[in-house]
Structures are given as C-alpha cells and as structure tokens.
C-alpha cells in the first residue's frame, strides 16, 4: 500500500487511499497489501505494477512481456488477470510468448523488421496456415532432406529405432513424401508468415 500511495501522490491522484483499495482488490493482492515488496513473488510484483498502472483508471493499458520470468502457475494467473482487465478497457500486449496471445487476445498484430506483417483476428491468422502443417516419420537421412526444404517446427525420437517424428511447414498442397495433415496453431501461422532464419536475427520480431 505504501508504494502505491507514494506513486499515486507523485502522479497527482486525489483521494489515493480509496483508489488504492480498489486497485489492489482488482488485481488480487488484498491479502498481501501490507507486506513488503521484497517478499513478493515475480507474479505478485507484476500485479503491483498493474495496480500502479490502474491508479488513474486508464482506458488503454499497455503491457510489455508481462509473463516473462514467471513460473507456469503464475503465468496462468496473470493471463487470467489480463483477460479480466480487458473486459473494461483496451489491453495492448507485447510479447514473444505465443501462449500469452492465444490465452488472452482476440486480435493480433505481427511486426517484422518494424513493419506490420499481419493485423487481424487470431482465428484468421491461424486459418491462413490450414493445409500447410504436416507430420511425418522419417529416417535421419530423410530428415536432412526435409530440413533443407521445409521449416521444421519440432523433431523428436520415436520408440522405433531409426525413425524421427517431425512436424513441418510447407506451402505445397501435398508434401512429396508420406505425411499427415495437422491442425495449425498460431505458432505455425507465425512461422509461415515470417521467413525463417538465424534465431539471433529474429529477436526484433514481436507480436502485439
């Protein structure tokens, strides 16, 4: 509470005590309101930051990589909080974590090298990958060939010696080897939309 009172006073908030009670209840930290910040978990500290942002009841809330560094349980709780806040205001979420988008967003904008590569409904983005996502079981030799021609989403060993299970992307209507179609995900659609390259070269890409 002391931190929020301090920040509220600095920002010219009138009657900060009443508003602070509202926001700490809204973000779910009422029971810990009188504890020291240094005792909070990463997720709790994120909630305090959101509470600070809500002090003046803004119509738009911009959050950047809000779940980075959180454990899975904290991440789920924080996503639910963002979804709740989105019912009353516009929440702009900037993140590289695909699960954050599918769990909290209805629309997405994908930036590639500072330019908009896609903007629209999540469902439209995912549907654009329909018929382009496949699964196959290949030998190590075949894997090298597939990898050179297609984007590999994942590869993992199987219980059968000499076989590798792969999920890959292709813009061909039918791969030239035995494969099964797979229901696309937002990650698949993203990888089809953005040309693949060295992972270090892709750090500038973002999803909002």
Describe every region a protein language model picked out.
Residues 5, 9-32:
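Conserved ABC ATPase "signature" region
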Residues 36-40:
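Conserved ABC ATPase signature
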Residues 50:
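Hydrophobic anchor residue at the start of the ABC signature
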Residues 57:
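Conserved catalytic motifs of ABC-family nucleotide-binding domains
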Residues 61-65:
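Catalytic Walker B motif of ABC-type/P-loop ATPase nucleotide-binding domains
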Residues 67-68, 98:
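Short loop immediately C-terminal to the Walker-B catalytic DE motif
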Residues 78-168:
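ABC transporter nucleotide-binding domain
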């Amino acid at each position: 509470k002391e931190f929020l009172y301090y920040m509220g006073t600095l920002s010219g908030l009138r009657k900060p005590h009443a508003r602070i009670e509202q926001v700490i209840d809204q973000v779910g930290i009422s029971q810990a309101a009188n504890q020291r910040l240094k005792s909070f978990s990463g997720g709790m500290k994120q909630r305090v930051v959101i509470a600070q942002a809500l002090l003046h009841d803004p119509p738009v809330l911009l959050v950047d990589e809000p779940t980075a560094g959180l454990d899975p349980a904290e991440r789920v709780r924080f996503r639910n909080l963002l979804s709740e806040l989105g019912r009353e205001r516009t929440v702009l979420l900037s993140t590289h974590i695909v699960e954050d988008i599918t769990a909290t967003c209805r629309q997405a904008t994908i930036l590639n090298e500072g330019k908009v590569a896609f903007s629209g409904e999540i469902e439209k983005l995912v549907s654009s990958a329909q018929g382009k996502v496949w699964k196959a079981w290949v030998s190590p030799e075949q894997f090298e060939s597939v990898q050179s021609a297609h984007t590999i989403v994942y590869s993992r060993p199987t219980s059968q010696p000499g076989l590798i299970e792969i999920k890959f992307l292709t813009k061909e209507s039918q791969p030239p080897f035995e494969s099964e179609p797979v229901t696309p995900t937002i990650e698949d659609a993203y990888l089809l939309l953005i040309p693949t390259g060295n992972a270090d070269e892709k750090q500038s890409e973002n999803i909002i």
